[in-house]
């Protein structure tokens, strides 16, 4: 059965100094946060989140909002699950026209497991190819996610994942490490941004935003 890895991030090998475990770091989109706050009679400032902003030279920064959730999977009746949780274990990536291209792992840990060929602790993670085939067989199933605001953010995530995967493969400081030794060294590299090619990411995001603006006009 489900071991709730996505909600606890508890693994013997995780020996972090800074990254919180004993719960999950969940991410909200800006409009999502506003919607949930308004529906519950709150202002955005009342929802305890940490803003993550990436200036990439577009019309405005790419922003996400992160918070630590300590419910450990027992959140029914306590909070509304964000889209991040509802989509797990995959994030769909669409073309700007709305065609489903691929399914990305929904957490940095699962991205790392996949990139290194390690088995994920997530016991409900299905075969990616089979899941993609299932989604493509019924386009209407993902229709609510084919909004330009959502698709842009999903595609932006794909750009970041691609950069991370390449940089991880070239990280000589992590080469040959496994278990706790790997994750201790990884934490510092990850949190200091050394596992990302920021010039590539910014360039790709500028092109991506320009394409969406051409097709949809102002969308975020």
Task: Walk through the language-model features, giving the residues of each.
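Short loop/turn segments that flank or connect secondary-structure elements
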Residues: 1-220
